[in-house]
Amino acid sequence: MLKIKVLILLSLFFTNITWADEPYVSESLLNEIGEKYKILAKKRFLALQQTLDSVKGKSDLEKLEAVNNFFNEVRYASDMKVYGKKDYWATPWEFLGNDMGDCEDYVISKYFALKYLGVDYKKLFFTYVHSTKFDEPHMVLTYFETPKSEPLILDNYNRKIFPASQRKDLTPIYNFNGDILDEAGKGNEKSHKKWDELKLNMQRKKI
């Protein structure tokens, strides 16, 4: 009887462990990154893990600020310059490994880091906008506390997080969240090809 109780308690204990208890950057991945991108990249990933560890258990806003600040230190560069492609959605490992990327890459890396930290992915959206300042299409990560809340904007152009009403330089076009579409069984539509490719690359831990 005692043995059964112990097994039940252990089962409950391990059930309550979230995936955030596992490192975002595993030791094997860290070694692969070191081999491909060398020591400075390895240090960047160690710094990322330290940043994420420092805000575990804190509020969503503190997590947003920490993740936004960390990834905004990465240099901006076009997909053509980094990957020789016109439009490519890089994994966080590629983005931080190269230490450069375009607006989609900032959004992707912030999204998956926040998801790892336990921020509800249903509050996070890849948001296509038009930047009136630069007169070009752009992407930002938006956070909705509730479906009716004014979203917060996480952007690589303006490094501070502001409510959407304070970003007059951005004209919203539409919001996108591939995980929500996948959950609804709509994740394989041709219009979401970039997301499907990204999912595969994330599963493979493409660096």
Language-model segment annotations:
Residues 18-207:
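A structural boundary/capping signal
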Residues 2-9:
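Sec-dependent signal peptide recognition
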